[in-house]
Regions:
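Aromatic- and acidic-residue-enriched segments that line the glycan-binding/catalytic groove
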Residues: 166-183
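A structural motif corresponding to the C-terminal end of an alpha-helix
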Residues: 1-7, 89-108, 139-157, 218
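Histidine-centered active-site loop/cap adjacent to the catalytic His
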Residues: 179-223
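Solvent-exposed loop/turn segments at secondary-structure junctions
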Residues: 15-22, 60-67, 103, 112-118, ...
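Extracytoplasmic/secreted proteins, especially bacterial periplasmic and envelope-associated proteins
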Residues: 37, 41, 78-92, 96, ...
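Short glycine/proline- and charge-enriched loop/turn segments
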Residues: 73-77, 122-129, 189-193
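Substrate-gating cap/lid alpha-helix
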Residues: 85-87, 117-160
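Conserved SGNH/GDSL esterase-like catalytic core that processes O-acyl groups on lipids
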Residues: 1-88
Length: 223
């Protein structure tokens, strides 16, 4: 998308699969050797490139909350404490990043889609789990937006980009009826894919493209 506008970006990927905010701050993780952490490398990068025009996307939070949603059940006593922890840890991360950033750095936070909506098509406990996950993910996105907003950082609305609130019924030939939001989830993630590819909570190529567009609408004119 940026290339189409004549803008050349050099990517520095600092993310690490399965990273929580806690492991980003303190380690350990499979991507960094102590004493380095993802956060320390990000701070160093920003200091070294202090005068550069830089875009930083921050995609954190889901793995901190997901400990409450494992085993296709929701531990309601877990959600509020984890969101309190998320708020405190993300504030710590954003404080370090913004202090290290130069005058030409743009930060964009990334909200999250709910990867469990497709379970609403199954009867029993998984259907209940899908319904209960909606409130938990909404709470998480509100918490993320509040923290990013306290640093004057916009947040890409990925949940809206994935049409999560669209509950209209879709009737398809030779297939069970479903809802628009579930249809989007099946297209934009691997949750409805057969083994060995799914079910997997991560985005498909189409999903990553939708997330990129949600970020792109927040970019300043120089990017």
């Amino acid at each position: 998308m940026e290339a189409a506008k004549g803008i050349t970006l050099n990517l520095r990927e600092l993310g690490c699969p399965g990273e929580s905010i806690a492991t980003m701050i303190h380690g350990p993780d499979p991507c960094y050797d102590a004493p380095d952490t993802q956060l320390s490398d990000a701070v160093t990068f920003l200091r070294v490139h202090h005068s550069a025009i830089t875009l930083v996307t921050v995609d954190l939070g889901f793995n901190t909350l997901d400990v409450c949603l494992r085993h296709r059940d929701i531990d309601r006593t877990c959600v509020s404490p984890q969101l309190t922890l998320l708020r405190r840890q993300l504030t710590y991360v954003m404080r370090d990043l913004t202090r290290a950033a130069g005058p030409h750095v743009t930060f964009i936070g990334v909200g999250h889609y709910n990867p469990y909506l497709s379970f609403s098509t199954k009867e029993g406990s998984t259907e209940t789990f899908a319904a209960n996950s909606v409130a938990a993910l909404r709470q998480m996105n509100r918490t993320l937006a509040e923290v990013y907003g306290s640093f004057k950082v916009p947040m890409a609305d990925v949940a809206t980009a994935f049409h999560e609130e669209d509950l209209r019924i879709v009737r398809r030939p030779h297939k069970e009826a479903t809802t628009v939001n579930v249809l989007y989830e099946c297209t934009l993630t691997w949750m409805c894919a057969p083994k060995p590819y799914g079910p997997n909570i991560h985005p498909s190529d189409a999903g990553y493209a939708v997330i990129a567009k949600a970020i792109a609408v927040l970019l300043p004119p120089n990017l």
